[in-house]
Every structure is written in structure tokens, then in C-alpha cells.
A protein has these predicted regions:
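Short phosphate-coordinating micro-motif centered on Lys-Gly-acidic
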Residues: 13
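Hydrophobic transmembrane alpha-helices and their helix-loop junctions in integral membrane proteins
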Residues: 1-8, 18-175
């Protein structure tokens, strides 16, 4: 598992490149539908990634990076008591990560990229989308949001639980 937030962010965004081609070029159906699904997937993911980039920069500014620490992005350093002194910005920073992870998860209401993408993706690509990519969003919520922003995460946990349940039920009923 990536224990460095910057490395995680790079890999988080790097996943888009092969999946774009797997969906857009090698999916099934007509080329226009494949291209539309691939572009929709990339735009959603890039929007989430851009929001998360603001969070990564904020973690650097308000965290150990402000003191010039070499390991400013290491999760163990970020989760140490008092490592992130963001004050009122802590909630905003946590939301930046949460939005990006909710898009990847895909959680209602930012899940609309998945049906069109899964519809044109081949079996192996769908396995990557559902078996790997979706889990990265959930993993990020648990391993990054909760430890770095424990107080802020506790405040939004009931909302996340409701959205997760709605996502599960919506997915089951729409399938």
C-alpha cells in the first residue's frame, strides 16, 4: 500500500490512462458510445483528482511540509498527533479528499460515470473498474481521510454511511 500521499496521488491519477484506452478503444459497441463513456469517465475522475490536488497541497501547507520536513507526505507522519494543524481548513481539506474518493467509489450522487462506462467495457475491463478502481475510492476514505482527519471524518460519517447505503441499494435495484 502507498504510504506516501504524493505517490498515492500520482498513482490515483495514473490509473486513468490505461482505463481510458481500455474503455474508449477496446470496449464493445459503436465507437461513438465507447468514446463518450471513456470521456465521461475521464472527466469525472479528473475533476475529482483536481479537487484532491487542492487537498494534497493543503495538507502540505498545513502539515509537516510547512516546517520543511522531508517526509511531509508520509502517512505515518501526517497521522501523528498534531501533525496537521489546519484549524478551520481541516474540514475543507477532508472534503477535497472525500469528493475525489466518492467519485472513484462510485458513490451516489457522483456515480453517473459508471453505468455508461461499464456498459461498453469488456469483461476484463469491467473487472478492473469494479474490482480495483472502485475499491481505491473506498480504501482512500478509510486509510487516508479517517486517519489524517479523524475529527472531521467523525462529523461526516453518518452522511457517508447513508450515501453508501443508498449507493448499495441503488446499484442493486438498477442492476
Amino acid at each position: 500500500a502507498a504510504r506516501d500521499l504524493l505517490l498515492f496521488y500520482i498513482a490515483f491519477e495514473g490509473m486513468l490512462v490505461p482505463l481510458y484506452f481500455l474503455v474508449g478503444r477496446y470496449g464493445h459497441g459503436d465507437a461513438a458510445r465507447r468514446r463518450h463513456a471513456a470521456i465521461k469517465f475521464v472527466l469525472y475522475s479528473l475533476a475529482g483528482g483536481l479537487v484532491m490536488l487542492f487537498g494534497v497541497i493543503g495538507v502540505y501547507v498545513y502539515g509537516p511540509g510547512a516546517t520543511g520536513a522531508a517526509d511531509a507526505f508520509h502517512l505515518d507522519r501526517l497521522t501523528a498527533d498534531g501533525a496537521l494543524d489546519a484549524g478551520n481548513m481541516g474540514f475543507f481539506l477532508m472534503l477535497t479528499f472525500l469528493i475525489a474518493f466518492a467519485i472513484k467509489a462510485p458513490m451516489v450522487p457522483v456515480h453517473t460515470w459508471l453505468p455508461s462506462t461499464a456498459k461498453v467495457a469488456r469483461g476484463g475491463t469491467s473487472t478492473l473498474l469494479v474490482g480495483v478502481l472502485d475499491k481505491v475510492g473506498t480504501w482512500g476514505m478509510i486509510v487516508i481521510c479517517w486517519p489524517i482527519f479523524p475529527h472531521e471524518s467523525a462529523k461526516v460519517a453518518p452522511v457517508i454511511i447513508v450515501l453508501a447505503l443508498v449507493s448499495i441499494l441503488w446499484g442493486a435495484l438498477a442492476a
